[in-house]
C-alpha cells in the first residue's frame, strides 16, 4: 500500500524528514492525501498480480493538485448529495438540542430511556452517511469497520462477518433509497460462489453449488475458520452464502430489475440452493421433514435440563428459516424469469 501527501497553495516553507511533513510559517495550505493499495480483485495475488499502486498514487496526486480546495469540496458535495438528499426524514416533536453534544444525548437515550426523536432522525441519516461513504468500491462492500479504522490491523481484521453483520449493513439500503450501493455485495458474492464451490467439495463432500462459513474477506475466503479451542458456535456454520444472497433478492424485489435477477441474483441464489439440497437430511425423528446436521445457531449455545452446554445440534430454527426463505424466493425468481420449472417444483 502507499500513502502520498502533497502540499499546494501555501505561503510558507515545506520540508520532509524521514516520514514527517513539516510546514513552517504557513498561514494557509492545501494538503492532498492519496491512498492506494495493490488489491486487484479477489482472485489476484496482491504482490504477483497486484495493481500498480505506486504509479496509481502518483498519478492521482498529480491530478488532484490541479483542483483547488473549493473545487474539490464542490465535487465531493455534488457526488454525496445526489445520494444523501433523496430522503427527507422527519419525526413529530423532534427538536435540535443546542446544548448537549451527540455522545451525551446517546448516553441519556440508552441509559435513561430519554425520548429523543431528533436523535433518532440523526441516527437514521448517520447510517445512510456511513453506507454512502463506505460502499462504493466494486466487490468490496462496507466491512466491520467501515471506511476508516483507528489501527493498521483493525479489529477482526476489518473483514466481513456474514452470520449477520454484513447482511444488516445492507438491510437499510433499499428502504433508505440507496439501492445502487448494494452493487459491491454482488461482486463479493460472485467471488464467494467461486471459492465456495471448493469449500462445499473439500469440507462437506458436496459437488453441487457453493457455500461459505461465517467469515470472509476481500479475497472471498469461504472456508470455516477457527483453531485450537475456538467455539463451533460461530466457526461450524455453512449458511453464510444462503443468507447473503437474500441481499441480492431484496435488491431485485425493490427494483424489479429482471435483467439483474436473470444475470446476477438468480444464478447465485440457485447455486446456494444446489448446495443446500445436498446438505439437507431426513429428520431421524420425522422422516417427512428435512433438517440440517450438524447445525449451529449463529454465535449462540444452549444448556440442557441436565446442565450440558453445547453449540451443535439437529435442525436449528435459524438454519431452517434461512433455507425456507431462500427456497421460496428462488422459486419466485424462476417463475418471474419463466425458467427452471422442474427445478422449482
Region annotations inferred by a language model:
Residues 1-160, 178-201, 334-338:
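Acidic/polar, glycine-enriched structural segments that form the non-catalytic walls/loops
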Residues 21, 68, 111-119, 157, ...:
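Conserved aromatic-histidine-acidic binding/catalytic patches
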Residues 41-50, 55, 143-159, 208-263, ...:
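The feature captures the catalytic groove of carbohydrate-active enzymes
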Residues 119-123, 165, 182, 240, ...:
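Hydrophobic (often cysteine-bearing) scaffold residues that line and stabilize catalytic clefts
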Residues 120-134, 241-250, 266-267, 271-276:
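Extended, hydrophobic/aromatic-rich amphipathic alpha-helical segments that build helical scaffolds
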Residues 123-126, 181-192, 260-276, 326, ...:
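Extended, well-ordered alpha-helical scaffold segments
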Residues 130-133, 166-179, 242, 248-258:
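Alpha-helical support elements that line or immediately flank enzyme active sites
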Amino acid at each position: 500500500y502507499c500513502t502520498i501527501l502533497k502540499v499546494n497553495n501555501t505561503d510558507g516553507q515545506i520540508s520532509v524528514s524521514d516520514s514527517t511533513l513539516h510546514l513552517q510559517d504557513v498561514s494557509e495550505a492545501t494538503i492532498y492525501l492519496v491512498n492506494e493499495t495493490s488489491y486487484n480483485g479477489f482472485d489476484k495475488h496482491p504482490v504477483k498480480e497486484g495493481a500498480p499502486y505506486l504509479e496509481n498514487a502518483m498519478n492521482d496526486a498529480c491530478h488532484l493538485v490541479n483542483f483547488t480546495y473549493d473545487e474539490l469540496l464542490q465535487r465531493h458535495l455534488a457526488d454525496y448529495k445526489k445520494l444523501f438528499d433523496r430522503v427527507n426524514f422527519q419525526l413529530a416533536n423532534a427538536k435540535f438540542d443546542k446544548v448537549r453534544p451527540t455522545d451525551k444525548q446517546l448516553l441519556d437515550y440508552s441509559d435513561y430511556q430519554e425520548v429523543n426523536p431528533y436523535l433518532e432522525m440523526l441516527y437514521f441519516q448517520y447510517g445512510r452517511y456511513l453506507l454512502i461513504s463506505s460502499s462504493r468500491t466494486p466487490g468490496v462492500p462496507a466491512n466491520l469497520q467501515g471506511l476508516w479504522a483507528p489501527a493498521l490491523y483493525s479489529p477482526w481484521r476489518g473483514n466481513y462477518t456474514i452470520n449477520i453483520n454484513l447482511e444488516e449493513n445492507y438491510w437499510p439500503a433499499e428502504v433508505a433509497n440507496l439501492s445502487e450501493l448494494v452493487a459491491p455485495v454482488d461482486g463479493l458474492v460472485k467471488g464467494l460462489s467461486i471459492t465456495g464451490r471448493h469449500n462445499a467439495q473439500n469440507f462437506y463432500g458436496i459437488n453441487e453449488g457453493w457455500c461459505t462459513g461465517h467469515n470472509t474477506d476481500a479475497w472471498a475466503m469461504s472456508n470455516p475458520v477457527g483453531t485450537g479451542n475456538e467455539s463451533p458456535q460461530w466457526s461450524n456454520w455453512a449458511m453464510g452464502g444462503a443468507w447473503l444472497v437474500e441481499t441480492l433478492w431484496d435488491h431485485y424485489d425493490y427494483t424489479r430489475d429482471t435483467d439483474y435477477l436473470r444475470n446476477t441474483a438468480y444464478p447465485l441464489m440457485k447455486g446456494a440452493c444446489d448446495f443446500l439440497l445436498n446438505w439437507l437430511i431426513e429428520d431421524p425423528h420425522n422422516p417427512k421433514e428435512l433438517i440440517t446436521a450438524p447445525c449451529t445457531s449463529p454465535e449462540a449455545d444452549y444448556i440442557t435440563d441436565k446442565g450440558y452446554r453445547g453449540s451443535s445440534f439437529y435442525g436449528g430454527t435459524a438454519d431452517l428459516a434461512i433455507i425456507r426463505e431462500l427456497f421460496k424466493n428462488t422459486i419466485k425468481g424462476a417463475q418471474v424469469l419463466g425458467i427452471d420449472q422442474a427445478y422449482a417444483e
